[in-house]
Amino acid sequence: MGAAIAIAGSVILRVLCGTNSRPDTLQAPIIVAFLIACVVAMLFGAFNGVLVAYFKIQPMVATLILYTAGRSIAAWINNNELPIVSDPTFSYFGGFIPGIPIPTPFFIAAACVLVIFLILKFTTLGLYTQSVGINENSSKLNGLNPTFIKFLTFVILGLCVAVAALIKVSRLSSINYSVIAKDIEMDAILAVALGGNSLSGGKFNMAASILGAYVIQFLTTTLYKFDVQSDALPAYKAVVVILLVVLSTPKVREWLSAVGKKLKQSKTIKEVG
């Protein structure tokens, strides 16, 4: 995901700056640059979708290809230069619009969440997606096409990546290929797990995942407050990921449930005695 954001962000800057890495004016409208980035990001999403859905490659392995090569592709798009956009309007997407105290990314994120919520809640796509996540074979027997649904999910992810890229590159009006959205994959996993959603797929709670994302941001800010170096942050987050993954396994849940029942029974016996 982070590498895909780097690619989409690089495309945006390439379109806006053209052949000059530091133009005085924009070489194309921002909306055009964003739409082109959307197409590129969706194509890379489709690439991952084909590997996972049609070639049955494990998602972790399939996405590892882009994870490894993505940042090099992003640097190649701009000839390994660091383009800078001087137009102040571009910085509004990652910062503040004059006169509005709330950051623009908040409005963008809220709009994206609302659109995705409406699609998943009031269209068949949401039902089909959850059905495939719960039981792919059962969905197929009921007439669904799990292969296409999984492919479409990766394409939609590409669109979300383009939105994230716009916010990321507009904050600095430039890009650092090796740093932009670094380790964001771990944050995404943590947000989903903290929200109580199953990492193996199925039913999900978007509101809980959003809350999980805020918890991750709070954790990051707190660690910085205690003077933890940025290079050490992934180690702390990895510990949290391991704990959450272990606690979410069926065997551990059964064990915790059994312990809870025993404690409840012992408490009842003491009260009766």
State the predicted function of each range.
Residues 3-7, 31-39, 61, 106-111, ...:
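Hydrophobic alpha-helical transmembrane segments
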Residues 29-37, 44-48, 99-176:
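Helix-loop-helix "hairpin" substructures at the membrane interface of multi-pass membrane proteins
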Residues 9-11, 38-41, 67-72, 108-118, ...:
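Hydrophobic core segments of alpha-helical transmembrane domains in multi-pass membrane transport
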